[in-house]
């Protein structure tokens, strides 16, 4: 890599999207794979990033990357297209346009506790009953 030309986060996200977009179910059901690939690529560039979670409906989960730069946090979501077809190149911004996704943003530990609670409540039974 040319040290004078450091990749910006949005360009890196676009490369991840381009690579995964050949998969038949992309962007649906790909937020875990895409966000992990993006997280690893951004970390390799020395960027301060973490995974964050949200949901629109009880039992539905969504994972994306948050980058912290100069005290500001920016969402990088390579699979936001599944929520809004106006974002084929992913979403980059301070807050989600979808009010439910924005309202329900949470950190990994809290989200995993929520998922466990929902499992215990039987929320996921309908998903597993057909298998």
Identify the residue ranges that each predicted region occupies.
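A structural boundary/capping signal
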Residues: 2-131
């Amino acid at each position: 890599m040319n040290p004078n030309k450091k990749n910006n986060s949005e360009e890196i996200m676009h490369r991840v999207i381009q690579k995964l977009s050949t998969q038949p179910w992309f962007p649906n059901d790909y937020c875990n794979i895409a966000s992990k690939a993006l997280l690893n690529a951004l970390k390799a560039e020395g960027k301060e990033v973490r995974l964050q979670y949200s949901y629109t409906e009880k039992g539905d989960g969504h994972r994306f990357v948050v980058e912290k730069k100069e005290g500001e946090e920016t969402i990088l979501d390579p699979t936001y297209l599944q929520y809004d077809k106006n974002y084929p190149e992913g979403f980059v911004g301070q807050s989600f346009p979808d009010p439910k996704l924005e309202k329900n943003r949470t950190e990994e530990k809290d989200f995993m506790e929520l998922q466990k609670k929902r499992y215990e409540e039987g929320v996921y039974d309908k998903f597993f009953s057909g298998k």
